Amino acid sequence: MNLKKVFILLFLVLAALWAGAQDQSYADCLTKTASKWGAPCAKCEYYKDMYKRDYSGTYQIDLQNVCSDMIEVKVAMEEKNGTWRTFPIKALGPKETMNAFACQGTGKYMYWVRRVNDTEILLPSDQEILTEYRSR
């Protein structure tokens, strides 16, 4: 009889662990690996003295998928004028990185993460981000 209780207890513990693994927060899979202020950015065209490119306000981050699952990521970077520069949803495999930037950044950024092909989690659209987080 005691052996039966042990097996039931073991089964319940394994079921709980398996259920917990299913509810993993994929936001924990994305880690900032680097950030840079004032580094050249080919996509930023801000000039001073009418002709010199000025990168002094650029803020760039590198984000890496540290999990073994493929994830989809949506990133937004805040510009000094209070708007958010959004980036298309990007799929990242294990150990893959992505770069995001703000040409006149504040240092604030946001990201949303889900497992690839997860239809239950909806990532926000650019319009939702621009409307919801305006001047925050």
At which residue positions do the language-model features occur?
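Bacterial N-terminal signal peptides that target proteins for export
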Residues: 1-7
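Low-complexity, acidic Ser/Thr/Pro/Gly-rich terminal tails and inter-domain linkers that flank the onset
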Residues: 23-54
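Terminal connector regions
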Residues: 30, 101-136
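Short, solvent-exposed loop/turn segments enriched in Ser/Thr/Gly
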Residues: 54-60
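Short, hydrophobic/aromatic beta-strand segments
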Residues: 70-76
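Intrinsically disordered, low-complexity Pro/Gly/Ser/Thr-rich segments with frequent PxxP/GP/PP motifs
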Residues: 81-110, 116
